[in-house]
UniProtKB/Swiss-Prot annotation:
<protein>
    <recommendedName>
        <fullName>Ribosomal RNA large subunit methyltransferase H</fullName>
        <ecNumber>2.1.1.177</ecNumber>
    </recommendedName>
</protein>
<keyword id="KW-0489">Methyltransferase</keyword>
<keyword id="KW-0949">S-adenosyl-L-methionine</keyword>
<dbReference type="InterPro" id="IPR029028">
    <property type="entry name" value="Alpha/beta_knot_MTases"/>
</dbReference>
<feature type="binding site">
    <location>
        <position position="73"/>
    </location>
    <ligand>
        <name>S-adenosyl-L-methionine</name>
    </ligand>
</feature>
<comment type="similarity">
    <text>Belongs to the RNA methyltransferase RlmH family.</text>
</comment>
<dbReference type="InterPro" id="IPR029026">
    <property type="entry name" value="tRNA_m1G_MTases_N"/>
</dbReference>
<dbReference type="GO" id="GO:0005737">
    <property type="term" value="C:cytoplasm"/>
</dbReference>
<dbReference type="GO" id="GO:0070038">
    <property type="term" value="F:rRNA (pseudouridine-N3-)-methyltransferase activity"/>
</dbReference>
<dbReference type="InterPro" id="IPR003742">
    <property type="entry name" value="RlmH-like"/>
</dbReference>
<dbReference type="Pfam" id="PF02590">
    <property type="entry name" value="SPOUT_MTase"/>
</dbReference>
<keyword id="KW-0963">Cytoplasm</keyword>
<comment type="subunit">
    <text>Homodimer.</text>
</comment>
<feature type="binding site">
    <location>
        <begin position="121"/>
        <end position="126"/>
    </location>
    <ligand>
        <name>S-adenosyl-L-methionine</name>
    </ligand>
</feature>
<keyword id="KW-0698">rRNA processing</keyword>
<feature type="binding site">
    <location>
        <position position="104"/>
    </location>
    <ligand>
        <name>S-adenosyl-L-methionine</name>
    </ligand>
</feature>
<comment type="function">
    <text>Specifically methylates the pseudouridine at position 1915 (m3Psi1915) in 23S rRNA.</text>
</comment>
């Protein structure tokens, strides 16, 4: 089973690459996370975010593995705490099905995309580079909960 993170934007600062690499390296080989940065739509002076989102949505769909569960990361998606995400990871792992996590560009995701469900990392608006690091850490945290590792100490005083 693989988790595919398909994110619009391919040029990330070094601190983002380092954070993503750190948490990805901690994941077990049987639960690999593949990060794929997809090019932004070419933005001109005319300013047509509908067209940009459509082009980026087409890139996301083209990069999504056939048969993968498709999850859109959106501010209005379902909120999950770390334990609920850990349960979700366990379900994905035991299904054997690949999972594609879609991260839109600066103008969001194309509304025409049809994800299997929508997930919100936070009700806050996060810069796209920050989303990648937070997502990497939360995927690792969820896996560590399932594996019984001491990394997560939620609810302890």
């Amino acid at each position: 089973m693989r988790l595919w993170v398909l994110a619009i934007g391919s040029k990330m600062p070094a601190w983002v690459e380092a954070g993503v690499a750190e948490y990805s390296a901690r994941m077990p080989p049987q639960l690999r996370v593949e990060w794929r940065g997809l090019p932004l739509a070419r933005r001109g002076r005319s300013g047509d975010p509908v067209r940009w989102r459509r082009e980026e949505g087409e890139r996301i769909l083209a990069a999504t593995p056939a048969g993968a569960e498709r999850i859109a990361l959106e501010v209005n998606g379902r909120n999950l705490d770390s334990e609920a995400l850990a349960q979700r990871i366990d379900t994905w792992f035991h299904s054997g099905r690949d999972v594609a996590l879609w991260v839109g560009g600066p103008d969001g995701l194309d509304p025409a995309l049809q994800p299997d469900w929508r997930w919100s990392l936070s009700p806050l608006t996060l810069a796209h580079p920050v989303v990648r690091v937070v997502l990497a850490e939360q995927l690792y945290r969820a896996w560590s909960i399932q594996a019984g590792l001491p990394y997560h100490r939620g609810g302890e005083e």
